[in-house]
Amino acid sequence: MPLLFLWFFLTSTSLVSALQTLPCINTTYFIPNSTYDTNRRVILSLLPSNVTSHFGFFNGSIGQAPNRVYAVGMCLPGTEEESCIGCLLSASNTLLETCLTEENALIWIANRTICMIRYSDTSFVGSFELEPHREFLSIHGYKTNETEFNTVWSRLTQRMVQEASSSTDATWSGAKYYTADVAALPDSQTLYAMMQCTPDLSPAECNLCLTESVVNYQSCCLGRQGGSIVRLSCAFRAELYPFGGAFTVMTARPLSQPPPSLIKKDSGKFSTETIAAIVVPIIVVAIIFLVLLVLSRLFARRRKSYQEIDLDQSGITTLHFQQLDFKTIEVATENFAKTNKLGQGGFGEVYKGTLVNGTEVAVKRLSKTSEQGAQEFKNEVVLVAKLQHRNLVKLLGYCLEPEEKILVYEFVPNKSLDYFLFDPTKQGQLDWTKRYNIIGGITRGILYLHQDSRLTIIHRDLKASNILLDADMIPKIADFGMARISGIDQSVANTKRIAGTFGYMPPEYVIHGQFSMKSDVYSFGVLILEIICGKKNRSFYQADTKAENLVTYVWRLWTNGSPLELVDLTISENCQTEEVIRCIHIALLCVQEDPKDRPNLSTIMMMLTNSSLILSVPQPPGFFVPQNKERDSFLSSQFTMGCTSQTKNDVTITNLDPR
């Protein structure tokens, strides 16, 4: 469904009023006082308190389709709670008063601080779109030496884009992609500027969003006393005065003085430094352009052009995707050399390769003897080509020939999670912070598959070896050969062919062949427990633990009041015990025997990101093996450290699903 958003950027009276020039326009509407309208009002009323309690950023949803409302709220980092709440309330009221029947809206507003609210009838977190954008400019002109101003402008904006988009923080907060800065202008004026991206973007996406916004500003607003560029996921504003609280929280730096090259000579001519500053960048850009042009043509000769592959699966009949010939794959992998072999999965081997343009890739060569090879190939191409998320491995192309079926993925340098997690010599590299971030990243990836992507995907084979780690240890879910598309109204499906990894499969799948999104939840629960203990779930069959499996072992520790005995010894002295116990609690809820008792991924995300939410009491897990007269007794109050009962939050477990 196409989305058309309402834009506001209410600042000083010097900016053109968006209220008059940009009425709420949309292709979809709701009926006033309908369920959608009620949900919209409820989630907008909840945003201020949740944004301030979640480091300046919060995203959530409320209701059930087709009346589900998704919303995001964000304030500047360092904003006082009262100012943030006031700004968000003002933004909410503006939306409610102006967008009377529109299902989609976005507002950036400047009051005592700057804040943003966006809501929609479809999920948008994790998606990146450059357009549409809106421009707001001062009605007052500004005249100065253009050459001198442009030099100061370029230095300031380039520095700010780099600073704002270079965050490696895995947490979502309003401070993740943010900067505010000032620069001294030649005419004794001061230029004030701020940039901010929503934290669901990748650093590269934030960089592109802000770079394009600076370019747009140069086209619309240079020569004016100020202006703003706003997009779905970022905003840029520059003025000749401090605004919206942005400069009460900025990193202090002395005002930059005009460089020596800007000092006018008595002769009235440009200095050598000024000429060099203009000419050298032009020459460098020209050389880079020529090199890229030559490389692109060389690469184009060595590969086949984009071709169609007909994959009739669940309504997706035609994909346009890069097809590589087998010779190119052989060269890239050095004829599938053993030294390039990364691993072996259920349907084939994986090799590291380097394409002619220098791109490192992971090449998955499906087994020729696998009866399911052709189907798994079609399935994986169809699904992964439609999925775009930072916590999912990216498919770059494929090779399809009579005797070969090959998938080409992005190369992830740190191999898979099991490579570190289950190796006593390497598991120490995964401290608790990294493990906790990995759990969060996997949660976001599965949530995207289950709820936020255009298709509803059940992975069916979540395990440590299918979680890849990039250079920053950010997890990426891989291996979609067994994944299935779930119908909109289909909660449970059946299969006669039970495939997967024992220990990760839930009881209803092993016994009855039934799978659903709750099957992935069970697998994820087992995976969380493995991440905490640093042991494979199947190792508990041989270990002297008096338990038949991992979930039984954990359940006994839990009921005995000693859950921390599960923790990997390499991290036990430097972990956050409250976080560890909460993760064990969540994992036990994920591995409940009855699928209905397992939380969905949006609820799991809520549990991980909001420590004040009270978790329900787990019952004995699926595949729990009782010992003698063991009974399922449990005191829930023992393991809710730091949790406080809050009426609003009690409701959010079922109604407000952050992602």
UniProtKB/Swiss-Prot annotation:
Residues carrying sugar: 26, 33, 50, 59, 111, 145
Gnk2-homologous domain sequence ranges: 19-124, 131-243
GO molecular function: ATP binding; protein serine kinase activity; protein serine/threonine kinase activity
Domain of life (superkingdom): Eukaryota
Enzyme class: transferase
Regions of this protein lying in the Cytoplasmic compartment: 296-659
Active site, renumbered: 461
Enzyme Commission numbers on file: 2.7.11.-
SUPFAM superfamilies, per database record: Protein kinase-like (PK-like)
GO cellular component term of the entry, any: membrane
Signal peptide coordinates: 1-18
Positions on the Extracellular side per record topology: 19-274
UniProtKB keywords: ATP-binding, Glycoprotein, Kinase, Membrane, Nucleotide-binding, Receptor, Repeat, Serine/threonine-protein kinase, Signal, Transferase, Transmembrane, Transmembrane helix
Catalytic activity: L-seryl-[protein] + ATP = O-phospho-L-seryl-[protein] + ADP + H(+); L-threonyl-[protein] + ATP = O-phospho-L-threonyl-[protein] + ADP + H(+)
Residue ranges of every copy of the Protein kinase domain listed in the record: 336-613
Residues bound to ATP: 342-350, 364
Locations listed in the record: Membrane
Family to which the UniProt record says this protein belongs: Belongs to the protein kinase superfamily. Ser/Thr protein kinase family. CRK subfamily.
PANTHER family named in the record: CYSTEINE-RICH RECEPTOR-LIKE PROTEIN KINASE 14-RELATED (PTHR27002:SF1064), RECEPTOR-LIKE SERINE/THREONINE-PROTEIN KINASE SD1-8 (PTHR27002)
Protein name from the UniProt record: Putative cysteine-rich receptor-like protein kinase 12
UniProt source species: Arabidopsis thaliana (Mouse-ear cress)
Gene transcribed to yield this protein: CRK12
